Amino acid sequence: MINHITDNQFKLVSKYQPSGDQPQAIEQLVDNIEGGEKAQILMGATGTGKTYTMSQVISKVNKPTLVIAHNKTLAGQLYGEFKEFFPENAVEYFVSYYDYYQPEAYVPSSDTYIEKDSSVNDEIDKLRHSATSALLERNDVIVVASVSCIYGLGSPKEYADSVVSLRPGLEISRDKLLNDLVDIQFERNDIDFQRGRFRVRGDVVEIFPASRDEHAFRVEFFGDEIDRIREVEALTGQVLGEVDHLAIFPATHFVTNDDHMEVAVAKIQAELEEQLAVFEKEGKLLEAQRLKQRTEYDIEMLREMGYTNGVENYSRHMDGRSEGEPPYTLLDFFPDDFLIMIDESHMTMGQIKGMYNGDRSRKEMLVNYGFRLPSALDNRPLRREEFESHVHQIVYVSATPGDYENEQTETVIEQIIRPTGLLDPEVEVRPTMGQIDDLLGEINARVEKNERTFITTLTKKMAEDLTDYFKEMGIKVKYMHSDIKTLERTEIIRDLRLGVFDVLVGINLLREGIDVPEVSLVAILDADKEGFLRNERGLIQTIGRAARNSEGHVIMYADTVTQSMQRAIDETARRRKIQMAYNEEHGIVPQTIKKEIRDLIAVTKAVAKEEDKEVDINSLNKQERKELVKKLEKQMQEAVEVLDFELAAQIRDMMLEVKALD
């Protein structure tokens, strides 16, 4: 367990008060956590304010909390919401820092070795460091993470023991401080001052922590004693104030002291000799030569620099772990008594289960053909049972909890009442005979009322044919297929909300960001064809797409009623009955959600010279494209500053498209 420096309380800031069945959900969750219950489920219907309930629980139980989402986009949305709810506490973001990642791999059939290739997002790397350092410094920490949090990260003990602690009056020579900084992978650069670097000017050492992006620290010496420490703006050097204590955390999460490094190198050398003997005995001379050359180079780098590319593949030796022992992960940076909340648990727990096997098969190929030592197999994500061993207390959050969650606990807390009074939609089943003409009539009725329609099909061909037919019938319709990129998808949803078109056809309309209050009709074709999108959970999630409009209605087109359909219909009717009773008792009239239509900082197409005028980037000349790139760069920076990394990545991709034309 890591000792914390400060013991702060969570302070929730919100203009809202718990309403509907939020108060009882919050009370039950808190009572169960304080009573020591290990696992429970918050089964919250779409639009009932689950994130607000989670925030209330965190503020009341006052435990460091890890919130896990199943992708970066959802993690980013949750991070933004928790930042708003807890402005005075440490809300951190921990996802994969790769913008692009091609893992190291070998394809024996074509004798192709694919070297690891990646592009690291500096902003996300900073936030990862901010998360781990916050966990060592304070206890009022919420970390919102993707499943990246179950991947190997390096020893938290080594990380904590390597912290360079400075305060005015401390007796330490300037050169000793410089050596200490180099030992924790800081780089000296007196000209290009960036995160993870330091510079020296006489008796002044300026240090730019890995967890900061604007502020650095100026350490001033008087002889062999620190005279004072000041926080400064990294760019301008402007002094922001003096500090009494400064903790400099390592610039990398994989850090080892000199003594441990010598032991690790000796173990790597011994394993190399052992594996070379195995290859030679099997007559694999090419593999033996390859492994010897690669590993000896890495050993030399570790001895001289304390680091090498792919250092994580030696993490078992550097951490002092036994073969097969789980790696250290973000979870090990938390104290023992921490809380885990799994958002959209029916998706996220499946991901946690699947990570290990995919990683293992790729690495086994590298080991068998002499690209890596067998110990590289222990640089891996956690198995699900290893993840479970880290769990002290956990809350699974989902509108449709999976079988796994239901096996873990019988404690299910429902949150069905929406603060807006909105009801789950009415669901009806209609025969497939004449379904297209029937649906056309329903669409026209919605168009007259300025409402939108979602249609979900099972095949790409059906979606395309349906779209073509409705276009011929004069309907403004679009088809959203799986090849559409995030930015384009956001544009389509925005255009649907604005009324540029009225009907959206798709196969999977359960992706994030497809909550549209203007949608009053959801049509499910082939509802009786069992499968992932037509099982009970898939149907309930799809039905939920019509739950943000007071006129919400769902039509399932099917010739038989499957068990999945019946269970989904029954569950929706049960929730609707509870919601109606609550509204009647409290005199609430359901109101369609009023949600602002946010234009992605006006860059979802191309920046136009005149407002509301779209421009084809192919029609721009070289100078105009240059100006467009400048505007996009500025907007990308603005997005980063407000921590909207998904948007920043979208703008970056667009910028690359424009640059590619030159």
Swiss-Prot record:
Looking at the record, the residues that make up the Helicase C-terminal domain are: 435-601
What does the entry list under GO cellular component? cytoplasm; excinuclease repair complex
Q: Name one GO biological process term.
A: nucleotide-excision repair
Q: Which CDD domains match?
A: DEXHc_UvrB, SF2_C_UvrB
- The organism encoding this protein is Streptococcus pneumoniae serotype 19F (strain G54)
**Domain comment text?**
The beta-hairpin motif is involved in DNA binding.
Record-given protein name: UvrABC system protein B
Assigned keywords, A-Z: ATP-binding, Cytoplasm, DNA damage, DNA excision, DNA repair, Excision nuclease, Helicase, Hydrolase, Nucleotide-binding, SOS response
Q: Which Gene3D superfamilies match?
A: P-loop containing nucleotide triphosphate hydrolases, UVR domain
The record ties this protein, via InterPro entries, to: Helicase/UvrB_N, Helicase_ATP-bd, Helicase_C-like, P-loop_NTPase, UVR_dom, UVR_dom_sf, UvrB, UvrB_inter
Q: Which GO terms describe its molecular function?
A: ATP binding; ATP hydrolysis activity; DNA binding; excinuclease ABC activity; helicase activity
Q: Which residues form the UVR domain?
A: 626-661
Per UniProt, residues of the Helicase ATP-binding domain are 31-188
Where does the UniProt annotation locate this protein?
A: Cytoplasm
Binding sites annotated in the UniProt record for ATP? G44, A45, T46, G47, T48, G49, K50, T51
For the motif Beta-hairpin, what are the positions?
A: 97-120
Assembly mode: Forms a heterotetramer with UvrA during the search for lesions. Interacts with UvrC in an incision complex.
Q: What does this protein do?
A: The UvrABC repair system catalyzes the recognition and processing of DNA lesions. A damage recognition complex composed of 2 UvrA and 2 UvrB subunits scans DNA for abnormalities. Upon binding of the UvrA(2)B(2) complex to a putative damaged site, the DNA wraps around one UvrB monomer. DNA wrap is dependent on ATP binding by UvrB and probably causes local melting of the DNA helix, facilitating insertion of UvrB beta-hairpin between the DNA strands. Then UvrB probes one DNA strand for the presence of a lesion.
One matching Pfam family: ResIII
Among SUPFAM superfamilies, the record links this protein to: C-terminal UvrC-binding domain of UvrB (SSF46600), P-loop containing nucleoside triphosphate hydrolases (SSF52540)
Is Protease among this UniProt entry's keywords?
A: no
The entry assigns this protein to a family as follows: Belongs to the UvrB family.
